[in-house]
Structure formats: structure tokens, C-alpha cells
Amino acid sequence: MSSWGRLSALPHEVIELADRAAVAAVLAHSRPGIAYGLGRSYGDACLNPGGTLWRTTGLDRLIDFDESTGRLVCEAGVVLRDIQDLFLPRGWGLPVLPGTRLVTVGGAIANDVHGKNHHQTGTFGDHVRSIRLQRTDGEAIVCGPAERADWFAATVGGLGLTGLIVEAELQLRRVPGPWLETETVAYAGLDEFFRLSDQSHPDWEHAVSWIDCTAGEAGRGLFLRARAAADQHGAWRGRQLSFPVVPPVSLVNRLTLGPLNRLFWWLNRRHLGRRIVHYQPFLFPLDAVADWNRAYGPAGFHQYQCVVPRENAADAIAGLLAAIAGSGDGSVLAVLKTFGDRWPPGLLSFARPGVTLALDFHNRAGIEALFERLDALVVAAGGRLYPAKDARMPRAVFEAGYPRLGEFMGYRDPGISSAMSRRLTGS
């Protein structure tokens, strides 16, 4: 079994969960384990080498839906894609969607995922009304913002470590349709990025940018923003491509990085200005290429995603970009975004107010030295790293970024363990 970063492929005992009534008995006889949905965590949050994975994709039932309020009760293995496909034609949709539709409800809660609209809608956990949690000792806990709120805060963003999420009640929202009015604006440096962010947040629901992190061009980028289109068009048929093989070496490396970034810049500059597009290619551009993670070759890749407080962001982001450009490493898919002012609901939720930078790095010998330099800059700025994307964060960096970790540990289920939990907490 492996995760999306393809950094390892190690043996696990995999137990398929298909009946929520039987979950308690399964957990009692197969611990320690960790829930595994679609495996879209990039690092080791969903892995337990030598131990058990409880695969939740069989817990895929919709239990109840209130058409008048948008309240949806479903099992934890339901995929966000399927909720969107079923309810969007009925005028409802999820308020928060991450960069891929291929995430389970349980995974979205456990990682408290965010989307391009964080500045207006917060994180996924902000729209969860209740969670049914199964502990490995047999206890079942129902928690929410107004019921056992302490357990809710520990479970949202809790990396699956407080118990197995069996089902959840979600609040959907009214949506006019699948079409978005979008605008792409080129910017020359970080000052322009911050100006565009501040200008966009009141009127544009979605806002994100691609930034060039290569030497000589670091700081230029393309700012993309979107909101519901006034006129909703007809049917849309997306093209599904696939990456058929794993190349012998990463196609993203020091030789190709500069040309790929220049190509990306040139291709997307052709689309400056406003257009009407379907929400899927805007919100989930990489979903159009199945198995795109194979492009990084047999060694896989790391994603490094951090958030730093807004008051320190200008210097911190400039320092991070300079360190990356100076190293000769970098990313074709470097994403820069400003989060909103809302604090997230979970004790270990990532998306705090500030500015987030995310980059993919092919896994090569010596890359850890760059990560250590980036870690130092993030910690000095008062920031933190995103556990859902992480496979190597030192324990000290985790503790510095998540000051409520000690409080969270009181809610740990001792029968649940992952490679990440052992690396970052010792158990």
C-alpha cells in the first residue's frame, strides 16, 4: 500500500469495512490500525506499515437528506465526487472542496481540508454538523459543534487518531449551477499578489495563484479567481486523460524545471481575462489526468505546504522562494493563496489565517537539506506545515506549529496508530 506521493510501497493488512454495524467488532480485533479511504494523503498519515489499514470505501451509503435544509447524513466512505454529481443537479453542493474530488468524507474531516474559497467559507469542518466516531474499545461517540464539542474539535483535523469516523452529517448549500465566471491576471511579484488577493476576496468566492519558483523568475505568477456565473450553461463533458506508465526517472527535475515553468506561463497567459468555465477544471485541474503522480518516477515526490501568519507573510514567502530558487530545485505546480481570517474548528486543523505556499518536489537524495532550510523559515515566521501533505516533518516543527497538540493527545485512541503518528507523537 502507498499514498499519493508514492514514496513507499509497504505491506499492510487491509481489512475492508462494508457494514457500519460491524465496525466496532472489526476494530476490537484488528488494532492497532488506521482508516484508509482513497489514499490521497501525500505522505504517511494514511499508512501503517506492518500493521492494519481499515479501508472505508465500502462505507459508501447515503443515509438521509433533507431537501428543504440541505442536511446530508452519509457514511464516511462516500466520495466527494459522488455527492457533487448527485446533488448539484438538484441545486445543492458541498461548501468546501479541496483540490481533488477523489476524497472520502472521512478523509476530508480527518484532514479538515480546505479549498480555493477558504476566505469566504472556511474549512470542510466548518460545515460538519455531527460525527459518529467508533473507538477501538467499543465506545461510540456522537459529537458536533454543539454536542461533545471537545471531541468534535479533536476529531476534525485529527488525522484519524481519535477513532474511526463511521458517518457524518454535512450541511450542503444552495448553488445556482456548475458554471463559473473566471478571471486570470498576470502579476510580476509578491506585492501584486497581495494586492490582488485583498482586492478579490470580497467579490470572488474562489481565489488562488500559480507562482514561478525558478531562479531568475521567482515571484511572477498568474492569479486565478472565480465566482458563480450569472448564466448557467448546458451540459459539460470533461476529457479524462491518464498517465499510463511510471517513467524510469522523474520527468520533473533540475533540467526540466525551468522549461516546464516557462511553458506553463506561456500556455496560461493565452487565457488572461474573463471566461465562463465549468467548475471542475477550475477547482480540480489535476483530476483531468488520472495517475498524474506517476510523472515523478519510481522514487515518488514530496509536497511541501506551509502557512505563515499574514503579518509575516511578505518576508517569509520571499525567503522561501529565494531558498527554493537558490537550491536549483522547485516545482511546476507551485500554489500561493491567502487564507481568510477564520480560525479552523479542529485542534490540529491546518488552515489558520495567513498565506499558504504549496510545492511538489521530486524525491531525490539531498532534498531534505532544502526542507530543513524551509522549515526554519516557516517556524521563525510562526507558521506550520500541512500534515495531510507531509512525509518527513520533524517532531519539533510539528510541535511548534500546533500548540494545542498536548490538549489533542488526551483524545487519542490507543488502538489507532499510523506511520505519521509514530513519527510525530511517538505512538
Please place each PLM-identified region on the residue numbering:
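Noncatalytic alpha-helical scaffold of FAD-dependent oxidoreductases
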Residues: 1-427
